[in-house]
Swiss-Prot record:
<dbReference type="InterPro" id="IPR006352">
    <property type="entry name" value="GlmM_bact"/>
</dbReference>
<dbReference type="InterPro" id="IPR016055">
    <property type="entry name" value="A-D-PHexomutase_a/b/a-I/II/III"/>
</dbReference>
<dbReference type="InterPro" id="IPR005845">
    <property type="entry name" value="A-D-PHexomutase_a/b/a-II"/>
</dbReference>
<keyword id="KW-0597">Phosphoprotein</keyword>
<comment type="function">
    <text>Catalyzes the conversion of glucosamine-6-phosphate to glucosamine-1-phosphate.</text>
</comment>
<dbReference type="InterPro" id="IPR036900">
    <property type="entry name" value="A-D-PHexomutase_C_sf"/>
</dbReference>
<dbReference type="InterPro" id="IPR050060">
    <property type="entry name" value="Phosphoglucosamine_mutase"/>
</dbReference>
<dbReference type="InterPro" id="IPR005841">
    <property type="entry name" value="Alpha-D-phosphohexomutase_SF"/>
</dbReference>
<keyword id="KW-0460">Magnesium</keyword>
<dbReference type="GO" id="GO:0005975">
    <property type="term" value="P:carbohydrate metabolic process"/>
</dbReference>
<dbReference type="Pfam" id="PF02880">
    <property type="entry name" value="PGM_PMM_III"/>
</dbReference>
<dbReference type="Pfam" id="PF02879">
    <property type="entry name" value="PGM_PMM_II"/>
</dbReference>
<feature type="binding site">
    <location>
        <position position="240"/>
    </location>
    <ligand>
        <name>Mg(2+)</name>
    </ligand>
</feature>
<feature type="binding site">
    <location>
        <position position="242"/>
    </location>
    <ligand>
        <name>Mg(2+)</name>
    </ligand>
</feature>
<dbReference type="GO" id="GO:0005829">
    <property type="term" value="C:cytosol"/>
</dbReference>
<dbReference type="InterPro" id="IPR005846">
    <property type="entry name" value="A-D-PHexomutase_a/b/a-III"/>
</dbReference>
<keyword id="KW-0479">Metal-binding</keyword>
Length: 448
């Protein structure tokens, strides 16, 4: 991660950290790095429903026009929609303005290359070097060489038609409840599932610029669980603000997370001969029950650091086509180049339809291990990981677990915290293991 770019683009409080002035520079320098080998390059821009989206879009567009780019505004659309359309429309770059599942005051800018993938570390470093230069030496075209801007609000429909053809059957006879987080999928998802002849009930579909992710969406699926039970729906589907995550709810109102969705998809893909190299890529935060369920079905798992970009890197490296995170980022690389909530939802509902099994039955095959995560504020994260007494207590606990549980002790990427997580067959054991480790961490390097 650099000075400006985090694990998912540039993020910050809009108009305070992520200012229009910075957005102009990001548009100008980012656009240049991605399009410098092309005369009159095409760049597409999408945004979610945040009130700050218009402000940042205007600044980004100005920056892009100033290097001679032709800009196409897509309006409100999901992040995977931008990724798909960048490649489908032969654009040299795509830009999404969103802070995903974050609260309304935050916003972010992320780029996609001509291939529809997020930027490499090298590309981000090149943009950062230009941002830090005292003098802007990039070309300044004038007159007829300046870029122009046009709108292509039909892009959302083009994307929906693409993902719709990834399933063979319609969804007639199914009642689907949708929670769109008052975000980018608010008009897209209801149209998609109604077009597939499902009966739909909706919530979180009235964005006003201020209510994105506010008690709704994939980080707050409790309201959707109530809607599913109230309406007698077969499944609930919750997306986040920019539509790259999915959390589901079964017909009984139980929450089905990203691990369970990945397991259901992996098993089905293996049975139908679609799972490449018989492998799923996930992060170290996936539940132990996920790995055990895969193992029981003869499926291999590959673990990465936390973050969908690391999952994607491993998928590309190994030629895998299914990966994701417990949080609901699920990547189906046969179809699209980033996590996609609506695409994942289509595949999940399609599996229900084809197998004629309710979601509760499909999800119950994966037995989740009780999990506890405790954050400990420390004086020095590096010292904590090198401390011999901390290493020793971790070793002792792992020996006691004897393969029937696991411990993960890792530093926070952004705060002076050590995260201590354990999974075990019972919640009591889980609590005991975590607190034994936490006590040693606090005694050795605790900041309080």
């Amino acid at each position: 991660m650099g000075k400006y770019f985090g694990t998912d683009g540039v993020r910050g409080v809009a108009n305070k950290e992520l200012t229009p002035e910075l957005a102009f520079k990001i548009g100008r320098f980012g656009g240049y790095v991605l399009t410098k080998d092309t005369n009159r390059p095409k760049v597409i821009i999408g945004r979610d429903t945040r009130v700050s989206g218009h402000m940042l879009e205007g600044a980004l567009v100005a920056g892009l026009l100033s290097i001679g780019a032709e800009v196409m505004r897509l309006g409100v659309i999901s992040t995977p929609g931008v990724a798909y359309l960048t490649k489908a429309l032969d654009a040299q770059a795509g830009v999404m303005i969103s802070a995903s599942h974050n609260p309304v005051q935050d916003n972010g800018i992320k780029f996609f290359g001509a291939d529809g993938f997020k930027l490499t570390d090298e590309q981000e470093a090149e943009i950062e070097a230009l941002l830090d230069k005292e003098v802007d030496e990039l070309p300044r075209p004038i007159g007829t060489n300046l870029g122009q801007v046009n709108d292509y609000f039909e892009g959302g429909q083009k994307y929906l038609q693409y993902i719709k053809q990834t399933v063979e059957e319609d969804f007639s006879g199914l009642h689907i409840a949708l929670d769109c987080a008052h975000g980018a999928t608010s008009s897209l998802a209801p149209y998609l599932f109604a077009d597939l002849e499902a009966d739909i009930s909706t919530m979180g579909t009235s964005p006003n610029g201020m209510n994105i992710n506010d008690g709704v969406g994939s980080t707050h699926p409790e309201g959707l669980a109530e809607l599913v039970k109230e309406k007698g729906a077969d499944i609930g589907l919750a997306f986040d603000g920019d539509g790259d995550r999915l959390i589901a709810v079964d017909e009984k109102g139980n929450i089905v997370d990203g691990d369970q969705i990945m397991y259901i998809c992996a098993k089905y893909m293996k049975e139908t001969g679609q799972l490449k190299h018989n492998t799923v890529v996930s992060t170290v935060m996936s539940n132990l029950g996920f790995y055990k369920a895969l193992e029981a079905n003869g499926i291999t798992s590959d673990k990465t650091a936390v973050g969908d970009r690391y999952v994607m890197e491993e998928m590309k490296r190994g030629g895998y086509n299914l990966g994701g995170e417990q949080s609901g980022h699920i990547i189906m690389l046969d179809y699209i180049t980033t996590g996609d909530g609506m695409l994942s939802a289509l595949q999940l509902v399609n599996i229900m339809k084809v197998t004629k099994k309710p979601l509760s039955e499909l999800a119950s095959e994966m037995k989740k291990f009780p999990q506890l995560l405790v954050n400990v504020r420390v004086t020095d994260k590096k010292l904590a990981l090198e401390n011999e007494k901390i290493k020793e207590i971790i070793r002792v606990v792992e020996e006691e677990m004897n393969g029937d549980g696991r411990v993960l002790v890792r530093p926070s990427g952004t705060e002076p915290l050590i995260r201590v997580m354990a999974e075990a067959p019972t919640q009591e054991l889980c609590n005991e293991y975590v607190h034994r480790i936490v006590d040693v961490v606090k005694a050795e390097v605790g900041a309080e």
